[in-house]
Amino acid sequence: MQKSFLLFLALSFIQCKTENYPITGTITLPFKTGEKYLSVTESDYQYSYHFIPLETKEESLLSKIFCIKRYNNYLYIHSLFNKSVMIFSDSGKFIKKIPIGRGPGEIMDPLYITIDEQNKQLEILDFFRQIKKYTLEGDYIASQPCCTSSEFEKLGNNYLFHSFTAQNSKNYFTVQSTNKETKSYLDSDKTKKPPLMAYSHLFKTDNTIYFHTDFNNIVYSISINNLTPKPYATLINQCTAKRINSLPVSKIDDFCMGEKLYINMLNFNVLHNGSTIYAEMITENNVETFLYDTDTQTTYLVDN
């Protein structure tokens, strides 16, 4: 009886130690490199990871992560659940929540966030077509009206927006500078252009904008210089891969919009499985990978 009791204590100690100190580990991600896309099948690709527990307090609670951006040792997290943008250090310390409201420096229904690397600023587009500018620490700087309320990226001193017209069913990009506004319509070829009102996301590299839709699973490449769109890669429609928690991943989608999956090899990969989100930001010279668990409010930074 005494031996059984000691064995029980030992097992309990081991279990508690494992749960309290989840610092590093290895996971197998279901990615297999193809010619133009990542195939979602079981593979032996190994990644190491470490945990970033986000500081939890009443004002920092979040869920339904729409976007995670990492810049200058900060994590900028756009939450759909409470319609907010929060700033954490890359060690998980809560820095600030951008105030919600319609006053100066406040945001209402943020649509998208981007980092102005040239001026080292956080920029947030809200529902009322205002671009709110903040320091990297979240202090308000100024507001600027914009031409539309849609996905946007900062290109030097200009902004690029993706929009569509309901009248003629054309998708177009609007480039807004300080003194002029120009529009560039997509190719009218129905085999190339995304259909009307297809949900999309933009991704920016140094010389190119990439965007894709959730309707035809085509990724488009647009040169920043001439805004000429062309199909870049076709995404897979179905998959049967399994995540670290052995739950199935099904269907292709963008970010964490439902229990779906979108894979864009060149710029952004997202696995969303239940409450677990795997997001991999890929540029030519850098790979940033995040694994976010909405149940435990934990962000995992994955190192290749």
PLM-predicted stretches and their roles:
Residues 1-4, 17:
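Positively charged n-region of N-terminal signal peptides that target proteins for export
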Residues 4-12:
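Sec-dependent N-terminal signal peptides
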Residues 16-304:
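Eukaryotic scaffold repeat domains enriched in small/polar residues
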